[in-house]
């Protein structure tokens, strides 16, 4: 009798579901399983996402211990902002009409047309598109990322051992920071180089130098309370409008300035790439967008604030997806200008999205490396970059931009089956070889009609 009772008791105990390998197992807002199947360990990457990875890989996984402070935002109703008008210059020095200092924003649920100027003029030539890029850059700085300063009044550099020292001065203030260079065992100097945020997470390509850029030293990303901290803010003031990602892009530009000043560093400054993963992947995309001397941008698993579009992510969130959105991300770290806070709950009024940010890189090289982790918004990333790809198509160089989304691996763990794709882009843009970079793949499909109501012109 007793044995029968215990057998019935065991049957009555619910079996707790477990997440599969590579599945989510925790995070703020997660209501699914919090344990993993046998042979897998739940690893926390940030307070919002934990993933089941093979136990043999758990000890080497990148896990974040950053705590997120509480943050309250209110919905803003204003749809205009004022800033002094600035003249803009397109690629090749083309003179472009400046945006007015005050503009009226209009709600648009679809992704903004890459080929229509803010004043309604259609883009029909490559020169006109360069003006559109300058306009989008200004809009993104004005409403999301903050103003990017130019080269400071004074800049000097020195090189010793493998360390490049950059000294900057502005308005009586000065800062100094360093990067370290690891040279390849093959190839000939001056070497092409990849600037890696936090050192980067990609394997070092043959014949290419790797430059370790400590972006956290330029602008902190500890939590929202770290806004205004770092070398950039020591120079320009803690209340500068630039968010951390803009500050990092400024730092990357100063590294390239310094390399141009110091030929003894043995770096070919016409063959510079930039990379980073996760939060640093967001930063790498921003640097590639703003710094035209970068010929190859390699953002890895950048998610929200990187290769994902705000509009698409908001929609997917409304459909039940566990995905990071604009209204959530501003409470994680000071990556954006505080101006952005007023728009995160009214994303459709923004006169751009992140397909616009990526399109600033065209026609230069861009290879977007993504994962299929829910929190990164893989559907949003693929849809967003599909829209961005139209910029390269319009310019007649569609193979200068590639996209690869492969899952079943830990966050920022570069899988071997993307190696040949990465090599092709590096060889084409950094080593001057002829390779096939017509790469655009994902397990998802992009519903272009839902987000795109404009066509791709052939620019003359």
Curated annotation (Swiss-Prot):
Induction: Induced in the presence of lactose or sophorose. It comes from the Eukaryota. GO terms for molecular function: carboxylic ester hydrolase activity; cellulose binding. Residues 18-53 form the CBM1 domain. Disulfide bonds join 96-131, 277-412, 309-384. Substrate binds at residues 282, 324, 332, 375. It catalyses: a 4-O-methyl-alpha-D-glucuronosyl ester derivative + H2O = 4-O-methyl-alpha-D-glucuronate derivative + an alcohol + H(+). InterPro entries: AB_hydrolase_fold (IPR029058), CBD_sf (IPR035971), Cellulose-bd_dom_fun (IPR000254), GCE-like_dom (IPR054579). Optimum temperature is 40-60 degrees Celsius. Residues 1-17 form the signal peptide. Keywords: Disulfide bond, Glycoprotein, Hydrolase, Lignin degradation, Pyrrolidone carboxylic acid, Secreted, Serine esterase, Signal. It is found in: Secreted. GO terms for cellular component: extracellular region. The modification Pyrrolidone carboxylic acid is found at residue 18. Optimum pH is 5.5. This is 4-O-methyl-glucuronoyl methylesterase.
């Amino acid at each position: 009798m007793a044995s029968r009772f215990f057998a019935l008791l065991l049957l009555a105990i619910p079996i707790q579901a477990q997440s599969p390998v590579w599945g989510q197992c925790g995070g703020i807002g997660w209501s699914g399983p919090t344990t993993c199947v046998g042979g897998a360990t739940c690893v926390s990457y940030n307070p919002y996402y934990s993933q089941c990875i093979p136990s043999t890989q758990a000890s080497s996984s990148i896990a974040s211990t950053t705590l997120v402070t509480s943050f309250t935002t209110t919905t803003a109703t204003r749809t205009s902002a004022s800033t002094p008008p600035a003249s803009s210059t397109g690629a090749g020095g083309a003179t472009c009409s400046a945006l007015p200092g005050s503009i009226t924003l209009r709600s648009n649920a679809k992704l903004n047309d890459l080929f229509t100027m803010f004043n309604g003029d259609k883009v029909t030539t490559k020169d006109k598109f360069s003006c559109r890029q300058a306009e989008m850059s200004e809009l993104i700085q004005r409403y999301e990322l903050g103003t990017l300063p130019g080269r400071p009044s004074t800049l000097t550099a020195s090189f010793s051992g493998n360390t490049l020292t950059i000294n900057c001065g502005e308005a009586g203030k000065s800062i100094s920071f360093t990067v370290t260079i690891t040279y390849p065992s093959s190839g000939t100097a001056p070497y092409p180089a990849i600037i890696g945020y936090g050192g980067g997470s990609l394997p070092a390509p043959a014949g290419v130098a790797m430059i370790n850029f400590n972006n956290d030293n330029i602008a902190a990303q500890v939590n929202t309370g770290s806004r205004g901290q770092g070398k950039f803010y020591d120079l320009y003031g803690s209340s500068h409008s630039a968010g951390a990602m803009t500050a990092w892009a400024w730092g990357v530009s100063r590294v390239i300035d310094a390399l141009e000043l110091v030929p003894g560093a043995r770096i070919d400054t016409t063959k510079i790439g930039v990379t980073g993963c996760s939060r640093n992947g967001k930063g790498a995309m921003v640097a590639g967008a703003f710094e035209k001397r970068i010929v190859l941008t390699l953002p890895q698993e950048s998610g929200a604030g990187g290769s994902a579009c705000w509009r698409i992510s908001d929609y997917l969130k409304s459909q039940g997806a566990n995905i990071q959105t604009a209204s959530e991300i501003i409470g994680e770290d000071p990556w954006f200008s505080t101006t952005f806070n007023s728009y995160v709950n009214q994303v459709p009024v923004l006169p751009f999205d992140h397909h616009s940010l990526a399109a600033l890189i065209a026609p230069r090289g861009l290879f977007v490396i993504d994962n299929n982790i829910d929190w990164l918004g893989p559907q949003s990333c693929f849809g967003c970059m599909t829209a961005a790809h139209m910029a390269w198509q319009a310019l007649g160089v569609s193979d200068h931009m590639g996209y690869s989304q492969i899952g079943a691996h830990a966050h920022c763990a570069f899988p071997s089956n993307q190696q040949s794709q990465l090599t092709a882009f590096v060889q084409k843009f950094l080593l001057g070889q002829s390779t096939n970079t017509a790469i655009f793949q994902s397990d998802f499909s992009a519903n272009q009609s839902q987000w795109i109501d404009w066509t791709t012109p052939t620019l003359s």
